[in-house]
């Protein structure tokens, strides 16, 4: 059974380890000498690590696929400032060698408490049409089960089971504060956008021991898929105001903020502008939190910058640990 997790690997730098990991991705790449090597991303519920198998991988590569759990032996090293696992041996794990829960990252928050908070927010709506629309989703048992479980992304922010619900509840909270600060904002419209903006991810993503995109997700994308889901629910709500329908759909269509970021329309109403920026803020704050946790797990010093964070195009500094009083040296 599993004893060493990704979060533990920093303790074993320049040492050999044997453990089990789930395969998040794999591909054969060319070496400078004309040969090939196998590049893998391995992971468990505590994180992921880039891995390389330079030799003797031909037979092993035919035994497993993305999403499988494998047993590996390799050396923990550091490449470009990040921990990496150089593999010597690899084989697929048998069913009795692992517990699935060890390999699937999941929210640290109570899912039922998150769900109750979301329902409570919807119950407080004064606009009964918007309330009926959102309830048509939350009262759908298939939707509710998927929404409780889905990740918000494959690798970036909230990339764990329950991550989408955690993100939405967090976003609803800061949207509530924004609506209080800007009284001209339509609070119920803003919260409706916050709750529904990413529902297309329930069909865009697939999740298990690894997170990936469905074929429809790759070809269509969660924004368009989310609009389709909203249209289906609106068809069951006769008398729904057409002007509200237009505004709700605009919120979803524009929530990425820019055409080059995947939104077919720019935000053109105050609620859509707020949703775009607050969604981005929540995602970035959680990305930073995850990077600080990874930095610490890999043995990084509290007062130093992290490695380059690709999704934010910069390194980061954790001010909470940077400003923490230093313990006096032991005599």
Residue ranges and their predicted role:
Residues 39-44, 207:
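Short, acidic/hydrophobic/Gly-rich beta-strand patch recurrent on exposed beta strands
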Residues 84-149, 225:
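Extended, charge-rich, solvent-exposed interface segments
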Residues 14-32:
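Structural detector for short beta-strands of small beta-barrel domains
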Residues 131-175, 196-200:
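A short mid-domain helix/strand-loop element embedded in enzyme catalytic domains
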Residues 1-20:
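OB-fold nucleic-acid-binding modules
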Residues 26-36, 47-102:
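OB-fold single-stranded nucleic acid-binding module
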Residues 155-156, 166, 176-298:
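Divalent metal-dependent catalytic cores for phosphoryl transfer on phosphate-bearing substrates
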Residues 271-331:
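Acidic, carboxylate-rich catalytic segments that either coordinate divalent cations
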């Amino acid at each position: 059974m599993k004893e060493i997790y990704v979060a533990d690997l920093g303790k074993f730098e320049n040492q050999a380890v044997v453990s089990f990991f789930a395969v998040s991705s794999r591909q054969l790449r060319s070496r400078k000498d004309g040969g090939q090597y196998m590049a893998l991303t391995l992971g468990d519920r505590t994180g992921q690590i880039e891995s390389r198998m330079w030799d003797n991988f031909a037979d092993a590569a035919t035994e497993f696929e993305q999403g499988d759990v494998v047993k590996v032996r390799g050396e923990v090293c550091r490449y470009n400032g990040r921990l990496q696992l150089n593999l010597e041996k690899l084989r697929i794990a048998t069913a009795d060698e692992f517990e699935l829960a060890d390999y699937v990252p999941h929210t640290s928050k109570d899912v039922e408490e998150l769900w109750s908070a979301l329902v409570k927010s919807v119950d407080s709506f004064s606009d009964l049409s918007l309330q009926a629309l959102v309830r048509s989703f939350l009262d759908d048992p298939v939707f509710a089960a998927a929404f409780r479980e889905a990740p918000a992304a494959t690798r970036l922010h909230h990339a764990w089971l329950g991550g989408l619900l955690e993100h939405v509840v967090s976003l609803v909270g800061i949207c509530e504060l924004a609506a209080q600060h800007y009284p001209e904002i339509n609070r119920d419209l803003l919260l409706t956008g916050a709750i529904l903006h990413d529902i297309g991810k329930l069909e865009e993503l697939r999740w298990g021991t690894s997170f990936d995109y469905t074929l429809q997700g790759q070809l269509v994308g969660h924004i368009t898929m989310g609009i389709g889901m909203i249209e289906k629910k609106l068809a069951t709500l006769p008398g729904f105001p057409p002007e509200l329908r237009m505004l709700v759909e605009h919120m979803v269509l524009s929530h990425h903020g820019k055409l080059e970021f995947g939104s077919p329309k720019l935000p053109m109403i105050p609620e859509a502008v707020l949703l775009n920026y607050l969604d981005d803020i929540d995602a970035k704050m959680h990305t930073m939190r995850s990077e600080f946790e990874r930095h610490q797990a890999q043995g990084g010093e509290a007062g130093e910058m992290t490695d380059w964070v690709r999704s934010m195009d910069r390194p980061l500094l954790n001010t909470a640990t940077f400003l923490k009083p230093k313990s006096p040296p032991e005599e």
